[in-house]
C-alpha cells in the first residue's frame, strides 16, 4: 500500500472509529471534535513530509502498516494532538504496546513502530529541540546541558537533541553516562549555562519518555516564558527547522562532556576526551556542604549505619552509593539482584502486562516490596541488621525510605516487619532535625510545600517560628513561590486563602473565579524578614533546600541546593538523621513517634492513584477521566448543600481549585470547567481533616489524597489512634471510589 492509497482509507477509518466511539459513549463530544479536526490532517502532513524520510526512514512504512491493519484507535491516539508541552517540557508514550518498546530498544530510534505527533519519538524530540533552540537564539542564549537517564534509547534521544543545538551554534555540555536529573539541574548554574534538558519520564512506567526542560538557574521555566516557548516556537515548528551537526563535526570549544574524573570505557567522545569535566565531583562536594555532623566519618568507624539501596533500574545506581560512600558511610548494601542496579528502561522487575503497568516509584509500597524481597535474596540474613533501605526513581529526583517497624506495631502493617515511610512523615522529620541543629534566626526562615503535602510540616514549622508558603502541586511552583518571597513580594500573598485572592483586591479582580497561578496560602510570612528557604518538599517524595536570595537569577539560592527535587540529596539528608538516631539509640520510626506526633498531633495522610497503575488509555481514557471529574463536581454540589458524607464523616465545607492552566487542553464549556488543582472536602472547621480529588492535566489519571488529624491532647494511646485513623483512611477511599465509580480493583499491599 502506498501513501496515495492509504490516505482515503485512513480518512474513512478514522471517521468511522470516532463516530462509533462517540455513539457508544466511549468518548465525549469535545474529545470527538478535537480528534476529528486534528487526526487526519496531522497524519496526512506526516505522510507527505519528505523530511521524515530523511530523518526516520522506517516511520512512514510503519504508519502505512498500521493503516493497512486498520488499527484506527492506535492511529487516532498517535495523531489526535501534539504531545502536550507542559510546565517541565514534554512527556508521553513512546508506543502503545510492549512489543513496540522492545523493538525500539533492540533496533534504535528508527525501529519500524507506529509513531505520530502524539508519541515521544525521534521526530518529535528533534522538532521540539529545534523550537527550543530557536527560542534560545532569539533570546541570546548560548550554552545548554543535556543528559539522559535509564529510559529506553535515552542516550540516542539526547544525542539527537544535542546535534540540533550544535547546529544552531550552542555550546553543548553532554553527560557521558545515564545521570540523575538533579545533576543536570546543578550543572546548569554551575557551568553558567542557559538551559538544560534531561531525556526522562521520571517515575512513569516503561512506555513513557520525555524531555525535561530547565532554565539558567536549574528550575523549570516560569509559566510566562514556557507559554512563549510553546505559543511562538513549538506550535509553529516544522521538520524544516531540523538540522543536525554530528559530534565529530562540532567546532572546537563547542562540545564538552560531563562525567567523572576519567573517561567512560564504552562511550564515544568523538576525539574530545580532553573536554571532559568532572561534574560528579562538583555535585558531590556541593551536597556535602549540607552535612551537619562534623565527625560523621569518625562516628561511622565505631557505630556504622547499615544502609540498603535500590536504584529501581535507574540512574541513581552509581550516584547514590558514591555520595554515601564519600560522605563516610561504610556499610552500603546495594541491591543487584534481578538487575535492579542496572540501567534498564524496560524496568523488568515491575509489572508490564497491558493495563497493569507499574511505575518504578520509590514512594509506592509495591516498589518497596520489590526492593525488600530482592534485598533478602541478594543479602541473605542481612535484612534484620538494616537501619534504612533507600530507593530512588529512574532519574533519581525522588527518594523513598523503608524502615523496620517495632514489633508491637507490626499489626498496623498486616504483620510486616517493615514499612515505607510516607514522604509526609519523612520530610517532617528532616525539617525537625535540621531545625534542632540550626535553631538560630528563625524569623528569617520559611519552608515551601505543595498543598497536598501534610500539615504536619506546617504545624512543626510554625511551632518553631518558621514561616510557611503552600503552593500548587509541582516543584516548578515551589521554586516560583520561593523566588517571589526572595523578591520581596510576600505582601501580594498574605491575603490569599485556599488559593484565592480577596475578591476586591487587584489580583482578585484580575483572576475572577480563578485561583492564584502559584500560591495556595501563606502562614506567618508577614513579618517582612523571611528570605531563607530551609526546605521545599512534596508529598510525591521530592525534596530540596533552596536557600536565601541568589546573587542573580542564574544562580542557586545563597546556601541553597538545586531548584528542583533531588533524590540523591534527600538520601544524603535522611542517612545523616538515621546515623544520628542510631547514636542516640533510636530509629527514624521511633523519632517520628516520640518527637513529631507529641509536638504537632497525629496527621495520617493517605494517597491512591486512579487507576492504580498506568492511566486510562488514549482518547477513550480521556473520556473516563472527565466522567469521574463530572461525578466529583456533582459531589461538590451535594457538599455545598450540606448533604454529603464520606465513610460516615459529614462534609462541613468544600472547595474547587482551578487556575485555568490546562484550559488549552480542556477548553471550558457551559457544563464543564477542568479543576486542574482538584476538589477538596473538609471534615472539620479547622480544615485539618480532608479528602482531595486531583486530576492530571497531561495524562489520563487522577490522584486521591486524604488527611486525618487528631490533636496531641486527644492522642491517648498513640498506636490505637494510628490504627483508627488508618482504618478510617481506607474507608474513605472505598466510599470515594464507590461514589466516583472508580473501584480500587488492583490495589496491592494496602
Language-model features and meaning:
Residues 2-354, 392, 400, 417, ...:
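Gly/Ser-rich phosphate-binding catalytic loop and adjacent alpha/beta segment
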Amino acid at each position: 500500500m502506498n501513501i496515495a492509497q492509504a490516505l482515503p482509507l485512513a480518512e474513512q477509518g478514522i471517521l468511522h472509529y470516532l463516530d462509533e466511539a462517540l455513539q457508544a459513549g466511549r468518548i465525549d463530544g469535545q474529545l470527538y471534535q478535537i480528534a476529528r479536526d486534528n487526526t487526519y490532517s496531522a497524519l496526512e502532513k506526516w505522510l507527505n513530509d519528505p523530511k521524515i524520510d530523511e530523518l526516520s526512514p522506517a516511520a512512514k512504512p510503519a504508519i502505512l502498516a498500521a493503516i493497512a491493519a486498520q488499527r484506527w484507535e492506535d492511529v487516532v491516539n498517535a495523531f489526535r494532538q501534539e504531545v502536550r508541552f507542559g510546565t517541565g517540557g514534554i512527556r508521553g508514550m513512546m508506543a502503545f504496546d510492549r512489543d513496540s518498546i522492545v523493538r525500539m530498544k533492540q533496533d534504535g530510534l528508527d525501529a519500524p513502530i507506529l509513531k505520530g505527533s502524539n508519541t515521544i519519538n525521534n521526530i518529535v524530540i528533534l522538532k521540539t529541540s529545534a523550537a527550543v533552540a530557536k527560542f534560545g537564539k532569539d533570546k541570546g542564549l548560548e550554552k545548554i546541558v543535556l543528559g539522559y537517564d535509564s529510559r529506553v534509547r535515552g542516550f540516542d534521544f539526547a544525542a539527537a537533541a544535542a546535534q540540533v543545538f550544535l547546529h544552531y551554534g550552542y555550546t553543548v555540555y553532554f553527560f557521558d553516562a545515564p545521570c540523575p536529573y538533579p545533576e543536570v539541574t546543578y550543572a546548569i548554574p554551575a557551568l553558567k549555562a542557559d538551559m538544560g534538558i534531561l531525556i526522562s519520564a521520571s517515575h512513569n512506567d516503561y512506555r513513557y519518555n520525555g524531555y525535561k526542560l530547565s532554565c539558567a538557574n536549574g528550575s523549570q521555566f516560569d509559566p510566562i516564558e514556557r507559554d512563549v516557548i510553546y505559543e511562538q516556537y513549538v506550535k509553529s515548528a516544522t521538520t524544516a527547522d531540523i538540522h543536525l551537526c554530528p559530534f565529530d563535526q562540532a567546532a572546537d570549544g563547542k562540545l564538552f562532556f560531563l562525567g567523572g574524573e576519567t573517561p567512560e570505557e564504552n562511550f564515544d567522545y568523538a576525539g574530545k576526551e580532553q573536554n571532559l569535566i568532572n561534574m560528579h565531583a562538583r555535585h558531590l562536594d556541593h551536597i556535602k556542604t549540607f552535612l551537619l555532623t562534623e565527625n560523621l566519618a569518625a562516628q561511622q568507624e565505631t557505630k556504622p549505619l547499615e544502609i540498603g539501596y535500590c536504584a529501581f533500574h535507574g540512574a541513581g545506581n552509581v550516584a547514590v552509593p558514591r555520595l554515601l560512600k564519600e560522605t563516610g558511610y561504610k556499610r552500603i548494601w546495594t541491591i543487584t539482584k534481578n538487575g535492579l542496579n542496572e540501567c534498564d528502561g524496560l524496568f523488568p522487575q515491575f509489572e508490564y502486562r497491558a493495563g497493569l503497568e507499574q511505575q518504578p516509584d520509590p514512594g509506592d509500597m509495591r516498589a518497596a516490596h520489590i526492593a525488600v524481597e530482592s534485598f533478602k535474596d541478594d543479602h541473605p540474613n542481612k535484612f534484620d541488621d538494616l537501619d534504612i533501605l533507600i530507593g530512588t526513581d529512574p532519574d533519581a529526583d525522588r527518594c523513598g525510605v523503608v524502615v523496620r517497624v517495632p514489633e508491637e506495631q507490626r499489626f498496623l502493617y498486616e504483620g510486616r516487619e517493615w514499612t515505607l515511610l510516607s514522604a509526609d512523615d519523612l520530610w517532617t522529620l528532616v525539617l525537625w532535625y535540621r531545625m534542632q541543629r540550626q535553631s538560630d534566626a528563625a524569623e528569617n526562615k520559611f519552608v515551601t510545600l505543595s498543598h497536598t503535602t501534610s500539615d504536619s510540616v506546617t504545624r512543626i514549622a510554625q511551632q518553631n517560628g518558621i514561616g510557611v508558603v503552600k503552593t500548587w502541586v509541582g516543584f516548578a511552583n515551589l521554586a516560583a513561590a520561593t523566588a517571589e518571597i526572595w523578591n520581596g513580594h510576600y505582601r501580594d500573598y498574605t491575603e490569599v486563602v485556599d488559593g484565592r485572592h480577596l475578591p476586591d483586591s487587584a489580583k482578585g479582580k484580575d483572576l475572577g473565579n480563578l485561583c492564584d497561578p502559584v500560591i495556595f496560602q501563606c502562614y506567618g510570612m508577614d513579618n517582612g524578614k523571611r528570605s531563607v528557604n530551609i526546605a521545599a518538599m512534596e508529598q510525591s517524595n521530592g525534596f530540596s533546600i533552596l536557600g536565601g536570595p541568589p546573587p542573580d537569577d542564574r544562580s542557586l539560592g545563597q546556601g541553597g541546593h538545586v531548584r528542583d527535587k533531588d533524590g540523591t540529596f534527600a538520601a544524603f539528608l535522611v542517612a545523616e538523621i538515621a546515623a544520628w538516631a542510631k547514636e542516640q539509640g533510636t530509629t527514624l520510626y521511633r523519632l517520628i513517634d516520640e518527637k513529631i506526633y507529641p509536638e504537632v498531633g497525629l496527621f495520617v495522610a493517605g494517597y491512591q492513584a486512579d487507576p492504580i497503575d498506568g492511566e486510562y488509555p488514549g482518547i477513550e481514557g480521556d473520556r473516563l477521566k472527565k466522567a469521574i471529574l463530572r461525578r466529583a463536581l456533582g459531589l461538590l454540589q451535594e457538599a455545598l448543600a450540606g448533604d454529603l458524607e464520606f465513610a460516615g464523616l459529614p462534609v462541613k465545607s468544600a472547595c474547587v481549585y482551578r487556575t485555568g492552566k490546562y484550559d488549552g487542553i480542556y477548553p471550558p464549556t457551559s457544563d464543564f470547567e477542568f479543576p486542574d488543582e482538584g476538589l477538596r472536602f473538609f471534615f472539620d472547621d479547622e480544615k485539618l481533616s480532608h479528602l482531595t480529588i486531583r486530576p492530571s492535566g497531561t495524562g489520563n489519571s487522577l490522584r486521591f489524597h486524604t488527611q486525618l488529624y487528631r490533636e496531641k491532647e486527644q492522642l491517648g494511646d498513640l498506636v490505637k489512634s494510628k490504627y483508627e485513623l488508618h482504618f478510617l483512611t481506607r474507608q474513605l477511599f472505598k466510599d470515594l471510589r464507590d461514589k466516583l465509580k472508580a473501584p480500587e480493583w488492583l490495589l496491592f499491599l494496602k
